[in-house]
């Protein structure tokens, strides 16, 4: 498994913004970064090549969700980019997730997105017509992802402990929606935890965006979050 360091969400719209942000970090500080839809759709595969040229690891967060054959073919293309981690939507079903695994191969970590951290209990039941608790829905998706041969899931840290109980010991739980203790603004995230809390309940990786990218001193903010994350072994 890759080193369990905090993953920085590069939620920017273009390469210029990314390079400006990365200038805050010493060149010897090798990072694990998340490239999402906005940046990837803006810059294309060239952003992957640029980030890899700097020695950083990449979580390509595109959340694929389509028919199995399309997902298989798409993953085979992404595998050639040299990414370290990527994902699909668990709602696509076991066959789609199996196809994603086949297309990606055995190198990069493949995760399934369960319920977004912006989704509340009420939204899930009303909009998705899922009459379960959030934790039961997330754990159901986690079990299906494991059945499909995926490496883990993306889920709120609030469900981390239950995921660990209902899957095998090597099954990864990556948690977004991480906020330092001093952060009061939750933005659009509804199910959040601090880095230390997430580690305690079983998170293997955390994704942190605005608390680092919007900080006055991004490198210092990153170091503080990394220190808190590593406080628990």
Curated annotation (Swiss-Prot):
Q: Quick one: a GO biological-process term for this protein?
A: 'de novo' pyrimidine nucleobase biosynthetic process
Keyword line: Decarboxylase, Lyase, Pyrimidine biosynthesis
Q: Top-level EC class, please?
A: lyase
Question: Which PROSITE patterns would you find in this protein's record?
Answer: OMPDECASE
The UniProt entry, under InterPro entries, shows:
Aldolase_TIM, OMPdecase, OMPdecase_AS, OMPdecase_bac, OMPdeCOase_dom, RibuloseP-bd_barrel
CDD domains per the record? OMP_decarboxylase_like (cd04725)
Q: Provide the Gene Ontology terms for cellular component.
A: cytosol
- Which residues are responsible for catalysis? 63 (proton donor)
The record's annotation in HAMAP family points to: OMPdecase_type1_B
Q: What is this protein called?
A: Orotidine 5'-phosphate decarboxylase
The source organism is Streptococcus agalactiae serotype V (strain ATCC BAA-611 / 2603 V/R)
Q: Which gene encodes it?
A: pyrF
